[in-house]
Amino acid sequence: MTKMISLEEARELVLSRVTPLEAETVDLLDAAGRVAAADLKSDIDVSPFAHAAMDGYAVRRCDLAGATAESPITLEVIDEVPAGGVFEGTPQAGQCVRIMTGAALPGCFDAVVKYEIVSMVEGDGKPGGRVAFSAQPKERDNVREAGEEARAGEIVVNKGEVITTAGVGFLAGCGVLRVPVYR
């Protein structure tokens, strides 16, 4: 009669007869479909800066304290920041900046109000115009913080995971250029 062994004993028996695959380091673009031979960590914070999570207006919450639908607060639009752009100015009280998704959030602002919920008062919402806000946004509303997707040193692909084409793109965004994979 055959003797039964425990699952742990069976596992140890199988593993004792397996030769681990060797690892090699390859260029990131050659890693798609390969298995990570080590935990892969981000080299940088992704995103490296706080940025607008959607199109809208970068505001200082203090400028909109007390804003309601019955008593909206109007701000002057002083600039427009495109995706990937940076605002270089210094706004005064009562001013805001039109900002696009992905643009760096100027440090003087603490929230982004969606374009769709703002009323145009003068102009078309672009620099030189005025827009009305019917509520004070929450702190950091519609803002993606620096490092929100990955922090420098954070594991972004675990050892033993298959590196997908999407994973290659994400690793590239994390500053990873070469990766250890199994042969």
In which residue ranges do the predicted regions lie?
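Short, glycine/charged-enriched hinge/interface segments at domain edges or termini
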Residues: 2, 7, 58-183
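Short, low-complexity N-terminal leaders and the immediately following helix N-cap/first helix
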Residues: 1-71, 98
